[in-house]
Amino acid sequence: MSIKSDRWIRHMAKQHGMIAPFEPGQIKQNTTGQRIVSYGTSSYGYDVRCSHEFKIFTNINSTIVDPKQFDNGSFIDVESDVCIIPPNSFALARTIEYFRIPRNVLVICLGKSTYARCGIIVNVTPLEPEWEGHVTLEFSNTTPLPARIYANEGVAQMLFLQADPDDVCETSYRDRNGKYQGQTGVTLPRT
């Protein structure tokens, strides 16, 4: 597998709809000229933005977190340009971008250093071959202080790995009828 460059990412987004909406360059300021956490195409990746939809963990119901029997009441829904994650807590969000991953590509997501240096960690499982949807983002605030996430700004970087022509997967995410195929919005655990 080889990592793909900005040229390849632009081509796949424009010609094959791999990322929508798509920013071909790197945006570092908003429309009023204020600095923001960057998003868009980088040398060997794509920095995604967070939408304004958030789900913040709460303990008001004192339930046990169980991925097989997940209680939707464990979250508070927030729509805002900013999400405040409580100390040592967790929030879900989604990307603005919708992805359509080719059969011969695997995408790995890494957090942005701007957030990591503040103790905010983003986790996303790999985007598998032929998966499509909005990416659900998992944010952990590892600090003893409240932490802020900004909507409509960069939050994570996607790295695109392309298989050699003789090594394309036999079974894709679509072939397996993956449970998160076509997800839109912030998607909670499914079994």
Swiss-Prot record:
Keywords: Hydrolase, Nucleotide metabolism, Nucleotide-binding. It comes from Xylella fastidiosa (strain Temecula1 / ATCC 700964). Catalyzes the deamination of dCTP to dUTP. It comes from the Bacteria. Transmembrane segments: none annotated. Pathway: Pyrimidine metabolism; dUMP biosynthesis; dUMP from dCTP (dUTP route): step 1/2. It catalyses: dCTP + H2O + H(+) = dUTP + NH4(+). The lineage of its organism: Bacteria, Pseudomonadati, Pseudomonadota, Gammaproteobacteria, Lysobacterales. SUPFAM superfamilies: dUTPase-like. This is dCTP deaminase. Gene3D superfamilies: 2.70.40.10. Its EC number is 3.5.4.13.
